[in-house]
């Protein structure tokens, strides 16, 4: 396949045009006064969004060289979304400003490689300053403010603050499309997994088709139980304690073992419940180990030399209640050692830090939440399908922003954290003139988010930036900034206009990374379009009569 190549000024001009086109579509969504973007599909109603990364993912330009610029800028938004879950529009605005200023210097003869080195030096100083500014998240009110700013909806902010209050910061929150037009949530207490009872004969509440057992003994094994002889020692040991409540979590229970449990249930000799173990393969063993630690039991596995008939009462877990329906099982308040549970959570968090797989990370986070004992389901409703999807995206952004704020703290919002970080560049040691130029590129770019917020609110961006700086000096308060909703200049921290430090940091790091790539690119290669054959036409299907 033949390729087409462009170089130097022509290549940089194509990249810049692609970057500017992408940024123009994305940055209109910045801030509470930002506009929506409607995205047409080949079928169905258009999707309407206020989310920068969603807009970025839709942009594909016709010119292949310009499209390269757009796709590089998309990387800044996507990577920020992956790391922090929010801040995608800020990353886009920053990257475009750096590319715009940097390409002017390259056109004037500056060495792009030294410019990039200057950008990297400046980034390190700026990230350190953002981390210094960060204040740890303490109150429910601050959580509400972070979520409200991200979602641009006080109702979503209040809902997430309530949920975090009830399930803790490590709890799992899943977001679903609801049936009505309102926002609702449902709390699931304890550890839940997606396996239900093996037989409906174990049901204790026939109206709800649920099996509920209070304070049972819990046998945990990765073995399939078919022979009754494997179960007898455990059944006898439980009955010897004067209790008859037993939950069995196993790969499967069938044959005469299942028949024995059902018959004893019918006679009232035992009150058993058998459920299938969650997960598959190695993940199943890990989840069974989690259940064992949560309930204070021991995983009976032949891999560690334990056969089922060797199980004693001491090996069985305990919990305040186990509830199971045909699809799900919930273990409420396991009797496991609190220190052992915390140690397991720490171990899982270390695995989250080291894993490179997004899927594994998600599953590990679910396990942490289940051990922490909190799962919430948010049901998002709206009058129409496009409104529902747009609102759901805002709830997801707000949730991600809240988690990011818990992780690394909060900084003043409204673009002020980046504005305040500019002074950190004064202490950066430079060796070449181009490095000093790169620091000036960063100084100008860091003003851009505040400038764009003001423009989207119908104000003059440069006037707002200068006024914020003047008021900060007059009040000797670095938290002073512009409230886009009211048009007033206020103490942003007191007004609850705050951003997660992790979001601001990630946006800056990814913007610098993409800007460095664009500035140091001097040639673009893409596939040449196939020439059209003269006189060729698409053959038509012959007419057919039926």
From Swiss-Prot:
GO biological process: protein refolding
Compartment annotation: Cytoplasm
GO MF annotations, alphabetized: ATP binding; ATP-dependent protein folding chaperone; isomerase activity; unfolded protein binding
GO cellular component terms given for this protein: cytoplasm
SUPFAM superfamilies tied to this protein: GroEL apical domain-like (SSF52029), GroEL equatorial domain-like (SSF48592), GroEL-intermediate domain like (SSF54849)
Coarse class of the protein's main subcellular location: cytoplasm
Positions of ATP binding: 29-32, 86-90, 414, 499
Keywords, in A-Z order: ATP-binding, Chaperone, Cytoplasm, Isomerase, Nucleotide-binding
Purpose of the protein: Together with its co-chaperonin GroES, plays an essential role in assisting protein folding. The GroEL-GroES system forms a nano-cage that allows encapsulation of the non-native substrate proteins and provides a physical environment optimized to promote and accelerate protein folding.
Record family assignment: Belongs to the chaperonin (HSP60) family.
Assembly behavior: Forms a cylinder of 14 subunits composed of two heptameric rings stacked back-to-back. Interacts with the co-chaperonin GroES.
PANTHER family the UniProt entry points to: 60 KDA HEAT SHOCK PROTEIN, MITOCHONDRIAL
Name of the protein this chain belongs to: Chaperonin GroEL 2
Source taxonomy: Bacteria, Bacillati, Chloroflexota, Chloroflexia, Chloroflexales
Gene: groEL2
């Amino acid at each position: 396949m033949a390729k087409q190549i462009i170089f130097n000024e022509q290549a940089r001009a194509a990249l810049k045009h692609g970057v500017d086109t992408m940024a123009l579509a994305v940055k209109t969504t910045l801030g509470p006064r930002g506009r929506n973007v409607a995205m047409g599909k080949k079928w169905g109603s258009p999707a309407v969004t206020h989310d920068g990364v969603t807009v970025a993912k839709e942009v594909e330009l016709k010119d292949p060289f310009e499209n390269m610029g757009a796709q590089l800028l998309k990387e800044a938004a996507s990577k920020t979304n992956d790391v922090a879950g929010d801040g995608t529009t800020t990353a886009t605005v920053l990257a475009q400003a750096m590319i715009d200023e940097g390409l002017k210097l390259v056109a004037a003869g500056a060495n792009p490689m030294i410019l990039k080195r200057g950008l990297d030096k400046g980034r390190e100083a700026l990230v350190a300053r953002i981390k210094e500014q960060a204040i740890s998240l303490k109150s429910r009110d601050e959580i509400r403010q972070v979520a409200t700013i991200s979602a641009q909806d006080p109702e979503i902010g209040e809902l997430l603050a309530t949920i975090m209050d009830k399930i803790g910061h490590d709890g799992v929150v899943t977001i679903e499309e609801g049936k009505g037009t309102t926002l609702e949530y449902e709390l699931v207490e304890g550890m839940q997994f997606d396996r239900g009872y093996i037989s409906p004969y174990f049901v204790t509440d026939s109206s709800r088709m649920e099996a509920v057992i209070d304070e049972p003994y819990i046998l945990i094994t990765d073995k399939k139980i078919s022979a009754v002889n494997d179960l007898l020692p455990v059944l006898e040991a439980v009955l010897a304690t004067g209790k008859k409540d037993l939950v069995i979590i196993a790969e499967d229970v069938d044959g005469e073992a299942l028949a024995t449990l059902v018959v004893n249930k019918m006679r009232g000799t035992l009150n058993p419940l058998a459920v299938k173990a969650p997960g598959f393969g190695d993940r199943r063993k890990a989840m069974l180990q989690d259940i064992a630690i949560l309930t204070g039991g021991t995983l009976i596995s032949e891999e560690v030399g334990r056969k089922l008939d060797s199980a004693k009462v001491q090996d069985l877990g305990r919990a305040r209640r186990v509830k199971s329906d045909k699809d799900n099982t919930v273990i409420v308040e396991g009797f496991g050692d609190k220190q052992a549970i915390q140690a397991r959570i720490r171990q899982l968090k270390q695995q989250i830090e080291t894993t490179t797989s997004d899927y594994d990370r998600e599953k590990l986070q679910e396990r942490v939440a289940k051990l922490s004992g909190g799962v919430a389901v948010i049901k998002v409703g709206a009058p129409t399908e496009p409104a529902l999807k747009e609102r759901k995206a805002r709830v997801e952004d707000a949730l991600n922003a809240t988690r990011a704020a818990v992780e690394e703290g909060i900084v003043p919002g409204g673009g002020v954290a980046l504005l305040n970080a500019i002074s950190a560049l004064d202490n950066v040691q430079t060796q070449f003139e181009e490095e000093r130029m790169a620091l000036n590129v960063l100084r100008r770019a860091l003003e851009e988010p505040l400038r764009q917020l003001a423009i989207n609110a119908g104000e003059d961006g440069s006037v707002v930036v200068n006024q914020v700086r003047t008021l900060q000096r007059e009040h000797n308060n670095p938290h002073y900034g512009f409230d886009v909703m009211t048009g007033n200049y206020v103490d942003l921290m007191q007004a609850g206009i705050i951003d997660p430090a992790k979001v601001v940091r990630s946006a800056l790091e990814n913007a610098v990374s993409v800007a460095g790539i664009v500035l140091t690119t001097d040639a673009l290669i893409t596939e040449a379009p196939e020439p059209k054959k003269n006189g060729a036409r698409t053959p038509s299907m012959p007419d057919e009569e039926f």
